[in-house]
């Protein structure tokens, strides 16, 4: 028998965090973060990481499990989630995967397999040096020549994954897209997949407001503190927003340019998330546009959970 799993996805700033806590409190769930950057300690403001006082007593997993200079791959994420789900179910709780990193979510719900491979840090450093020497877009163009499928999926600014894809190709001669396979016909869990959406103009306004709030909360100081302990080229420091603030601190961008770039790149990231999740045919979409939409969506998700698993009661057990 397949284990139960609720999957809650949506673009950045749509409101997944607060809604997921409300649902988890109602049905007795534990939340597994599906965000590839919230795994890193000390990267709190810029990743919109939930604060302990916001968790409402709901256990959260896969947050603050790595230092920023440590590697964290989708394969490791998949393995950790696969270990967590039976543990959560054994406690009589409902596992709920919440996030916006599409590949991470898909690796859990579909039958993805990954080719194990050691990291080549010298090769990665050389590739990053080539990008700095030749300018933005150089490595993406190289990737397009050897692995067009991955290049089409990755944004030219997603240097982390572009470097990883080129690393795999140089090590094996095989595109990384060919080493990741999925059987889409058979889900790995007895899942309920929910997608959150919102009017695009309202979402973009929320993104701009959230960036301003993060900066006012001390995001730049957070980046300064990280740079004291870690070099700017480590994987985590290439994350959205952190990279732009590092460029500002190095004098390569003005403050106004950095803020504008963060907002623009975050809006573009949200658009790519929409595109990715729209491909998931099993998602039930709920619109969060409007003042009462969030409460209605919470009630609807709770209803769907109890409809799918009728024995699911508050803090109860799925028999």
UniProtKB/Swiss-Prot annotation:
- Entry annotated with the keyword NADP: no
Keywords, in A-Z order = ATP-binding, Magnesium, Nucleotide-binding, Transferase, tRNA processing
Q: Read off the Gene3D superfamilies from this record.
A: 1.10.20.140, P-loop containing nucleotide triphosphate hydrolases (3.40.50.300)
Q: Which cofactors does this gene product need?
A: Mg(2+)
Q: Which SUPFAM superfamilies match?
A: P-loop containing nucleoside triphosphate hydrolases
Name the EC number(s): 2.5.1.75
Q: Which GO terms describe its molecular function?
A: ATP binding; tRNA dimethylallyltransferase activity
* Residues the entry annotates as binding substrate: 12-17
Q: Which InterPro entries match?
A: Dimethylallyltransferase (IPR039657), IPT (IPR018022), P-loop_NTPase (IPR027417)
Q: Does the keyword ATP-binding apply?
A: yes
* Site positions (Interaction with substrate tRNA): 101, 124
Q: What does this protein do?
A: Catalyzes the transfer of a dimethylallyl group onto the adenine at position 37 in tRNAs that read codons beginning with uridine, leading to the formation of N6-(dimethylallyl)adenosine (i(6)A).
Q: Which family does it belong to?
A: Belongs to the IPP transferase family.
Identify this protein by name.
tRNA dimethylallyltransferase
